[in-house]
A protein has these predicted regions:
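N-terminal entry/capping and adjacent linker segments that precede and initiate structured domains
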Residues: 1-389
């Protein structure tokens, strides 16, 4: 291999799954440096998005390890750990972040996760779950005279043209809500900067409990709003740092019980009519209401259970569409047979959070300047060891 031109080596490696690529780092310094090569990182990410087999699902669950003390567990499944057809097995990601046993995933972008501290109510880390690398985010804006926020929503996005990543937080304060203003304050962090920027009030409030952006499409993050008279999809253009409105589909039932997702790079919406059916829509031309197209409809009577809230997770192998059903199960729709079925996952917890993820070599450390804290956790048979940078 070392006799091949570097360009050919990079081309070969760019087509490999993320797990064997990360293992290469343990071989020698040459392979460690090669997996940090910017050309390989870019080519591998490009190949991963082209290949549907590169899709994985990251699961987060909380395990009771002591009285009143929970620890967060990260696991994943992909096309390579199917036991037989629809039977999958959780693979644990044996990583530990410093001083942070309990966290939530509030964004996945280009192989990186944005991790949120639910106790402090702040975004805490940018983390690559397959390489173990992380970077600590600077503390967000919190007025010293104000009590802690009531709620915080997060978005994590990327500018392709400039290779810039941004985190946005929408912060709700009880005092403002009490005074009749339910709109959150918007703060933006460009990764590489040492401080957040206050860009003013968002024009809409979001659905209560909607912490994470549900879709990153066309350079914009998307949430749902339930302000009186404004049942709409709220967008945030990551480049322009401007809020906007995207029209939702004209659902067959007229009821708005929907969740957003991304299917083949397009905004999608899954809606359900209580106890009767669920329908999936895709926006073929971004921002154009008439381009919403219904992909399929599934009746509860045909599948034998009440479907309820579902959220599109993405296309799996053979064009199947995976859906999150509530917070405890996965469904798969097969467009060839027009059938919906449940997915069995060995070792799955009773409840979990799940995000669609494409494994990458993108390093959180490369996105930050000097003066911030970096780390790398390397798992092995003897446990987990931290390397500081």
């Amino acid at each position: 291999m070392d006799k091949l031109p570097r360009e050919i080596i990079i081309n070969i490696l760019s087509r490999l799954p993320i797990k064997p690529l990360v293992r290469c780092r343990c071989l020698c310094k040459f392979w460690l440096n090669l997996t940090h090569d910017s050309q390989l990182i870019t080519m591998h990410l490009h190949q991963s998005f082209k290949n549907e087999d590169s899709l994985s699902l990251i699961f987060l669950s909380n395990i009771l390890v002591a009285p009143n003390h929970f620890q967060t567990r990260l696991s994943f499944i992909d096309n390579n750990n199917s036991n037989n057809g629809d039977h999958y097995t959780f693979v644990d990601l044996n990583v530990t972040l410093p001083h942070f046993d309990n966290f939530e995933i509030l964004g996945s972008c280009n192989g990186l996760l944005c991790l949120f501290d639910p106790l402090a109510k702040i975004p805490r880390y940018i983390f690559n779950p397959f390489s173990g690398e992380y970077a600590t985010l600077p503390n967000p804006i919190r007025p010293s005279s104000s009590p802690p926020p009531r709620d915080v929503a997060i978005g994590f996005g990327y500018l392709l043209e400039s290779n810039v990543y941004k985190v946005i937080e929408l912060v709700y304060y009880s005092s403002a809500i009490f005074n009749g203003d339910s709109r959150p304050e918007a703060h933006v962090l460009t990764l590489g900067d040492c401080s957040w920027r206050n860009i003013g009030k968002a024009p809409f409030s979001l659905i209560r409990g909607s912490k994470a952006s549900q879709a990153f499409v066309n350079g914009a993050l998307h949430w749902l709003s339930d302000m009186p008279g404004f049942d709409c999809i709220v967008s945030f253009d990551v480049g322009e740092e401007q809020f906007g409105v995207v029209p939702h589909p004209e659902f067959e039932s007229g009821q708005l019980n929907y969740r957003l997702g991304v299917l083949r790079g397009r905004l999608s919406a899954a809606n359900y009519n209580y106890g009767e059916y669920a329908e999936m829509w895709v926006m073929n031309e971004y921002g154009v209401k008439s381009s919403w197209t219904k992909c399929f409809k599934v009746n509860c009577s045909e599948v034998g259970f009440n479907i309820g809230y579902v959220r599109p997770l993405g296309r799996w192998r053979s064009g199947e569409v995976w859906l999150l059903h509530g917070s405890s199960s996965l469904l798969c729709y097969d467009p060839r047979t027009k059938s919906l079925r449940k997915i069995s996952i060995a070792g799955s917890p009773h409840a979990f959070q799940v995000v669609t993820h494409v494994g990458s070599l993108v390093s959180p450390q490369s996105l930050f300047g000097e003066g911030l804290h970096f780390g790398l956790f390397v798992g092995g048979d003897e446990g987990v060891h931290q390397l500081e940078f």
